[in-house]
C-alpha cells in the first residue's frame, strides 16, 4: 500500500457513526457484538463523564452525564478521538529498523516510513530489543520512566501496565518530578512542608464567604478546570459563577495578575494587572519592600509561624546587595507603576486575602523563585490557615476546593512487581550512573551520558541510554526544543511506542503498537479527583477498531512471552480486575458510604457519595504549630532555608531572589533580536495533545488549518498581519507555521500558541519524509519547536518552557500541507 492509498482509506473520517459503514470501523465492530444499541452507556474522561448511544456498532450520540451541570464542549470531540485518520491501526515497525534492528540508520528516524507486521512479530521484536539492551548495557541502557496524563481509568493506566510488564523483564532508568509542576513541587516542601501543587485547597464556600480579595496570580481556572486527572465533575464552575456575582456586587475584589487577559478575567469581569513576562518576582519583592517600610506586615504571625524573616529583610531593603527592592526599582522591569505596587501592598493586608497561584509561572528559568516568594508574601500578610485567606497552588486544577467526601476510592492496577517477584534480568548495576533522573533532563542524558549535575541537594550522573519506551505518552508534545530532540533520538538504538494515535512520538519510534481508546474497553474510575464525589463505571462504548488492543491485553501478551502471564494478571481477566477493585472499595467504605453490589453498580453506571465537607488548608498548623508542624526541617514556614543555602547553588540560594533570565522580553536579554515572548500555556480546547486528533472538533478553532497564534493588534500591524494569515514563528531553535488571531487580550511583545499542538515537520521540499531533517519546518504549529531546553535551576532541574523569545512574520508563498494527522507512509517489503 502506498501513502495515497493509505490516506484514501482514511478519507471518510468525517463520518461519525450517523449511518452506514465506515472504513474506520473493522468488520467485527459492525457485527453483532452483543452491545445493546438502544441504551445509553456511561463512561468518563479527563473532559468529564458522559453517555453515548450507538448505531451500527459505532458511536452515534454523545451527551453530558446527568450529574455534570457544567459540561465542557470538549465532549463534542469524543467521537473524533475514536474515528480519525491518526489512529494507529496495526502493529508497525520503522522500515530500516525492521531490516537492520539496533544497527539501523537512526538519521532516518522520523521519515515516517513504516511496515505493517503481526502482533506476534511486533511483540517478539520488542522483547528482543529489551534482551539486547539488558545484555549489552544493563539497566542503565533502558529508560522507561515516563510521565504523562494517560487515559482515565484505574485499570488501564498505560504507565502502570508498561512499567509492570517491562519491570518483569528487567530494571530500568526512572524519573522524578513532572513537567506540570516540576519547580513548584521541589521548592515548596522546603518552604511549606509539602508539594502543595497537588494538595487539597480551602473549600470554595469558605473562600466565597470570607475572602475580601482574591488574587489570581498567573492563574486561569475558567480555562483549566475543564479537565481533570480523573473523570472531572466540573463542580468548581458553580463556585466561579457565584464569585462572578460577588464581583459584580462589589462583595469580593478579584485581581488577575498576568501578562495577558485570561478567560477567567474576562468571565469574572474582574481587575486586570498586566505584568511583563517572567518578572513577577520583582513585583512581589517590591510589594514586600512596601509592606516592610510601611509596617503593613503581620510581625506576630511571622514570629510565631515562620523562620528566616530576619535573613530575608536585608536583601529586600538592599543592605545585602546595595539594591533596595523598591517599587521604583521594580517598575521598569515588571511594567507595573510604583503607585500601583504601593496600592496593591495596602490592598493585600486590607481584609481577608486569598492568593491563588497558577502553575505556568514556575515553568520558567528560576521557576522556584515566584512560588517561594508568593509564600513569603502570604506569610507577611499573616492569614495562612484562615478560611478565605493564605495561599494555594491548585485551585485551577481538577476541582481542588470543591468540598470533598472522605470515601475510599477504588484502587488501581499495580505499577510495580508483586512481593518476591524478580525480573528475568535482575541486575541493579547502573554502571556508576543514577537510576533516577529529573524528568525534564532525559534529552540531556542521551546527549551527554556520564555528565554529573546537581539536583535537589544530590549529584545525578546521567546514564548512557540506548532504548526508550513510551506507553500512552507523548514527549514530542511536552518536552522542549524539537531539533535538539532529533539530535538525541539519532543516538538511540531503539524506541518503542504504544499509543492510540500516530503522535510525533510514534513517528520518531521504531516499534509502534496500537492501543485502543478509552471508549473501546471497560474500566472503573473516581468521579472527581479531589471532590471524590463517587465511582464511575467506564463501560465499553464500541469494539476496538482495527487491530488495536487494550493496555491490559497488550502487556498480558507481552508478559506471556516472558512466561509471566499469570504473575502479571494475578490470574484475573479485565472484568474480574474491575469487579475486584470495586469490591475492595465497597469493603473499605462499609458503614460509611453505601455501595450496591457490583452488578447493580455496573448497570446503573455510577455510585454517588453525596456532598463533601468544608475544610481550610493549614488550619491545623495555625491552631497549634507545635502539635501540627509543617513538613519543613523546622516545622515552620521557611522564608529562609538553611538546607537550600547549604547546597551552595548560585541559581537557587537561601531565600527567594530576583534572577535575570537567559532570555526575556520587554528589554531583557535577547529581546533585541527576538522581541516577542512566547506563552505556550495549556490549551482552551484540548488536554495537552489529547483531542488534537479529533478532526471536526479541531476545525472549530484552527485558523487556515493551523494552530492559532494569538497576537496583539500593535504587533500584528507592525508586521502587516491580519486575522487568518499564515504566520511563520521562529528563533534560532526552530520554526513553525500557525494561523494568526489578532486580539486585544494580548499586549505588545507577547504571543501565545497553546501547547499540545501536534508536531508536523516537513522537509524543505514540503515532503513528509523530510520531516526527519534537523531544522525542518513544523507545518501545524507546535510551540515546543521553539522553546528552550534548560533546567529551572540546580534545585529542581525542571522544564523552563516559558523562558522563550521568538519573532514572527507573514508567511510568503504556498504553505506546505499539514503533516501532523495523516499517519505513516506504509511500505511493503
From Swiss-Prot:
<dbReference type="GO" id="GO:0030151">
    <property type="term" value="F:molybdenum ion binding"/>
</dbReference>
<keyword id="KW-0732">Signal</keyword>
<comment type="function">
    <text>Reduces trimethylamine-N-oxide (TMAO) into trimethylamine; an anaerobic reaction coupled to energy-yielding reactions.</text>
</comment>
<dbReference type="Pfam" id="PF18364">
    <property type="entry name" value="Molybdopterin_N"/>
</dbReference>
<keyword id="KW-0560">Oxidoreductase</keyword>
<dbReference type="GO" id="GO:0009061">
    <property type="term" value="P:anaerobic respiration"/>
</dbReference>
<dbReference type="InterPro" id="IPR009010">
    <property type="entry name" value="Asp_de-COase-like_dom_sf"/>
</dbReference>
<protein>
    <recommendedName>
        <fullName>Trimethylamine-N-oxide reductase</fullName>
        <ecNumber>1.7.2.3</ecNumber>
    </recommendedName>
</protein>
<keyword id="KW-0574">Periplasm</keyword>
<dbReference type="InterPro" id="IPR050612">
    <property type="entry name" value="Prok_Mopterin_Oxidored"/>
</dbReference>
<dbReference type="InterPro" id="IPR041954">
    <property type="entry name" value="CT_DMSOR/BSOR/TMAOR"/>
</dbReference>
<dbReference type="GO" id="GO:0043546">
    <property type="term" value="F:molybdopterin cofactor binding"/>
</dbReference>
<dbReference type="Pfam" id="PF01568">
    <property type="entry name" value="Molydop_binding"/>
</dbReference>
<comment type="similarity">
    <text>Belongs to the prokaryotic molybdopterin-containing oxidoreductase family.</text>
</comment>
<dbReference type="InterPro" id="IPR006657">
    <property type="entry name" value="MoPterin_dinucl-bd_dom"/>
</dbReference>
<dbReference type="Pfam" id="PF00384">
    <property type="entry name" value="Molybdopterin"/>
</dbReference>
<dbReference type="InterPro" id="IPR041460">
    <property type="entry name" value="Molybdopterin_N"/>
</dbReference>
<dbReference type="GO" id="GO:0050626">
    <property type="term" value="F:trimethylamine-N-oxide reductase (cytochrome c) activity"/>
</dbReference>
<dbReference type="InterPro" id="IPR006656">
    <property type="entry name" value="Mopterin_OxRdtase"/>
</dbReference>
<dbReference type="InterPro" id="IPR006311">
    <property type="entry name" value="TAT_signal"/>
</dbReference>
<feature type="binding site">
    <location>
        <position position="180"/>
    </location>
    <ligand>
        <name>Mo-bis(molybdopterin guanine dinucleotide)</name>
    </ligand>
</feature>
<keyword id="KW-0500">Molybdenum</keyword>
<dbReference type="InterPro" id="IPR006655">
    <property type="entry name" value="Mopterin_OxRdtase_prok_CS"/>
</dbReference>
<dbReference type="GO" id="GO:0030288">
    <property type="term" value="C:outer membrane-bounded periplasmic space"/>
</dbReference>
<keyword id="KW-0479">Metal-binding</keyword>
<dbReference type="InterPro" id="IPR011887">
    <property type="entry name" value="TorA"/>
</dbReference>
<feature type="signal peptide" description="Tat-type signal">
    <location>
        <begin position="1"/>
        <end position="31"/>
    </location>
</feature>
<dbReference type="GO" id="GO:0009055">
    <property type="term" value="F:electron transfer activity"/>
</dbReference>
Amino acid at each position: 500500500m502506498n501513502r495515497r492509498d493509505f490516506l484514501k482509506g482514511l478519507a471518510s473520517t468525517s463520518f461519525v457513526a450517523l449511518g452506514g459503514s465506515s472504513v474506520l470501523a473493522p468488520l467485527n465492530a459492525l457485527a453483532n457484538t452483543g452491545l445493546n444499541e438502544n441504551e445509553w452507556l456511561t463512561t468518563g474522561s479527563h473532559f468529564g463523564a458522559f453517555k453515548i448511544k450507538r448505531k451500527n456498532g459505532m458511536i452515534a450520540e454523545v451527551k453530558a452525564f446527568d450529574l455534570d451541570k457544567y459540561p465542557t464542549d470538549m465532549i463534542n470531540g469524543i467521537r473524533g478521538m475514536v474515528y480519525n485518520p491518526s489512529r494507529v491501526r496495526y502493529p508497525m515497525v520503522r522500515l530500516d529498523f525492521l531490516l537492520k534492528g539496533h544497527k539501523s540508520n537512526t538519521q532516518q528516524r522520523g521519515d515516517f516510513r513504516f511496515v505493517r507486521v503481526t502482533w506476534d512479530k511486533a511483540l517478539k521484536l520488542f522483547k528482543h530489543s529489551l534482551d539486547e539492551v539488558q545484555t549489552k548495557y544493563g539497566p542503565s541502557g533502558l529508560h522507561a520512566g515516563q510521565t504523562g496524563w494517560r487515559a482515565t481509568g484505574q485499570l488501564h493506566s498505560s504507565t502502570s501496565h508498561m512499567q509492570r510488564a517491562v519491570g518483569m523483564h528487567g530494571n530500568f532508568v526512572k524519573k522524578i518530578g513532572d513537567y506540570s509542576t516540576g519547580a513548584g513541587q521541589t521548592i515548596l516542601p522546603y518552604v511549606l512542608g509539602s508539594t502543595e501543587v497537588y494538595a487539597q485547597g480551602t473549600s470554595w464556600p469558605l473562600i466565597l464567604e470570607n475572602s475580601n480579595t482574591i488574587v489570581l496570580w498567573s492563574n486561569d481556572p475558567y480555562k483549566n478546570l475543564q479537565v481533570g486527572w480523573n473523570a472531572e465533575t466540573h463542580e468548581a464552575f458553580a463556585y466561579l459563577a457565584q464569585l462572578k456575582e460577588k464581583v459584580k456586587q462589589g462583595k469580593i475584589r478579584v485581581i488577575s495578575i498576568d501578562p495577558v487577559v485570561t478567560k477567567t478575567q474576562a468571565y469574572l469581569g474582574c481587575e486586570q494587572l498586566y505584568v511583563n513576562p517572567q518578572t513577577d518576582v520583582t513585583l512581589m519583592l517590591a510589594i514586600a519592600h512596601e509592606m516592610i517600610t510601611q509596617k503593613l506586615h503581620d510581625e506576630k504571625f511571622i514570629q510565631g509561624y515562620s523562620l528566616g524573616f530576619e535573613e530575608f529583610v536585608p536583601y529586600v531593603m538592599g543592605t545585602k546587595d546595595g539594591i533596595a527592592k523598591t517599587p521604583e526599582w521594580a517598575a521598569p522591569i515588571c511594567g507595573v507603576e510604583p503607585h500601583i505596587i504601593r496600592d496593591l501592598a495596602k490592598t493585600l493586608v486590607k481584609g481577608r486575602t486569598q492568593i491563588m497561584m497558577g502553575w505556568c509561572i514556575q515553568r520558567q528559568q528560576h521557576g522556584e523563585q515566584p512560588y517561594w516568594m508568593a509564600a513569603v508574601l502570604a506569610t507577611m500578610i499573616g492569614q495562612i490557615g484562615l478560611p478565605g485567606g493564605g495561599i494555594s497552588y491548585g485551585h485551577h486544577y481538577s476541582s481542588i476546593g470543591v468540598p470533598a467526601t472522605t470515601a475510599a476510592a477504588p484502587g488501581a492496577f499495580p505499577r510495580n512487581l508483586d512481593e518476591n517477584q524478580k525480573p528475568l534480568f535482575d541486575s541493579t548495576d547502573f554502571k556508576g550512573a543514577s537510576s533516577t533522573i529529573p524528568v525534564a533532563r532525559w534529552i540531556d542524558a542521551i546527549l551527554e551520558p556520564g555528565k554529573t549535575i546537581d539536583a535537589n541537594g544530590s549529584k545525578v550522573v546521567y546514564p548512557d541510554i540506548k532504548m526508550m519506551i513510551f506507553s500512552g505518552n507523548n514527549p514530542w508534545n511536552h518536552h522542549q526544543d524539537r531539533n535538539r530532540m532529533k539530535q538525541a533520538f539519532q543516538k538511540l538504538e531503539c524506541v518503542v511506542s504504544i499509543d492510540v494515535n500516530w503522535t510525533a512520538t510514534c513517528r520518531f519510534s521504531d516499534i509502534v503498537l496500537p492501543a485502543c481508546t478509552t471508549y473501546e474497553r471497560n474500566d472503573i474510575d473516581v468521579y472527581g479527583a479531589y471532590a471524590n464525589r463517587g465511582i464511575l463505571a467506564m463501560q465499553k462504548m464500541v469494539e476496538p477498531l482495527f487491530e488495536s488492543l487494550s493496555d491490559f491485553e497488550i502487556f498480558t501478551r507481552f508478559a506471556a512471552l516472558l512466561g509471566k502471564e499469570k504473575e502479571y494478571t494475578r490470574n484475573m481477566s479485565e472484568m474480574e480486575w474491575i469487579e475486584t477493585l470495586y469490591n475492595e472499595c465497597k469493603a473499605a467504605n462499609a458503614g460509611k458510604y453505601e455501595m450496591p453490589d457490583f452488578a447493580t453498580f455496573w448497570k446503573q453506571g455510577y455510585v454517588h457519595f453525596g456532598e463533601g465537607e468544608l475544610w481550610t488548608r493549614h488550619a491545623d498548623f495555625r491552631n497549634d504549630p507545635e502539635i501540627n508542624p509543617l513538613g519543613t526541617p523546622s516545622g515552620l514556614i521557611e522564608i529562609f532555608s538553611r538546607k537550600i543555602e547549604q547546597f551552595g547553588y548560585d541559581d537557587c540560594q537561601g531565600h527567594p531572589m530576583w534572577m535575570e533570565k537567559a532570555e526575556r522580553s520587554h528589554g531583557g536579554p535577547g529581546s533585541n533580536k527576538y522581541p516577542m515572548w512566547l506563552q505556550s500555556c495549556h490549551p482552551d480546547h484540548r488536554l495537552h495533545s489529547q483531542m488534537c486528533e479529533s478532526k471536526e472538533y479541531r476545525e472549530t478553532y484552527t485558523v487556515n488549518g493551523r494552530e492559532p497564534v494569538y497576537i496583539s493588534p500593535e504587533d500584528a500591524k507592525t508586521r502587516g498581519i491580519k486575522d487568518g494569515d499564515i504566520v511563520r514563528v521562529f528563533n534560532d531553535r526552530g520554526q513553525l507555521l500557525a494561523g494568526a488571531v489578532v486580539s486585544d487580550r494580548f499586549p505588545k511583545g507577547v504571543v501565545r500558541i497553546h501547547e499540545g499542538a501536534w508536531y508536523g515537520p516537513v522537509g524543505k521540499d514540503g515532503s513528509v519524509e523530510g520531516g526527519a531533517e534537523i531544522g525542518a519546518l513544523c507545518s501545524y504549529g507546535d510551540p515546543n519547536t521553539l522553546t528552550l531546553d534548560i533546567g529551572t535551576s540546580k534545585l529542581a532541574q525542571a522544564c523552563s518552557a516559558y523562558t522563550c523569545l521568538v519573532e514572527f512574520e507573514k508567511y510568503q508563498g504556498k504553505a506546505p500541507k499539514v503533516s501532523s494527522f495523516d499517519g505513516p507512509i506504509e511500505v511493503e517489503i
